[in-house]
Amino acid sequence: NQNQLTEIPVNYYENLLQLDLFLRKITSKEAGRKLEEAVKLILEARYIIFIGVGSSGALAEYGARYFTNIGLESYAISDPYQAVKGKGAPDVLSIVLSASGETDKIIERVVKLREEAPAKIISITNHPETTLSKLSNINLTYGFQTEYSAYDPLENLTSQLPVIAFIEILAHQAMEKADKCN
């Protein structure tokens, strides 16, 4: 029968199994509380700055576009040397994306933001015990197995699907909560 779906073997792409586990984990009470805290910061912000470099920079662009499309004023910074509008303002939220949580230019940017004022920072990283996660008000983590390119061993190929999931979940929860308040 041509209409039957074929099942993809688990060993076809290991990250599919990891994604399934991640999606189950984010429905837990603990994850729910963290997401609620993040949504509260999002709704308190005058505007949101997504920050990332490399693949995380592309996802920062996606996050800013997605949030803007639901009515949350957002900008993306994928160049670590770009100036930040209203930096250090207490009503500006930075959502910082970094799979490793250790990218030098990202850490430098976050340290500067924290020195200038009580910056509010949500980070999305692959692991919870990173420099970036420790500098953040809230850290959302996905815990995938780190994967590097055989072509260029310095290139991180860890799946970024959870980052997209976090961005979309946060946006939708913020939109729903804002609608209830209005």
PLM features: what roles do these ranges have?
Residues 34, 49, 181-182:
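Secondary-structure transition/capping residues
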Residues 5, 176-182:
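Short helix-loop capping/hinge segments that flank enzyme active sites or metal/cofactor-binding pockets
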Residues 33-45:
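Glycine-rich phosphate/diphosphate-binding loops that line cofactor/substrate pockets in enzymes
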Residues 1-34:
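HTH-adjacent hinge/linker in prokaryotic transcriptional regulators
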Residues 43-178:
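Glycine-rich phosphate-binding loops that contact phosphosugars or nucleotide phosphates
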Residues 22-26, 41, 173:
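Residues that form generic nucleotide/phosphate-binding pockets
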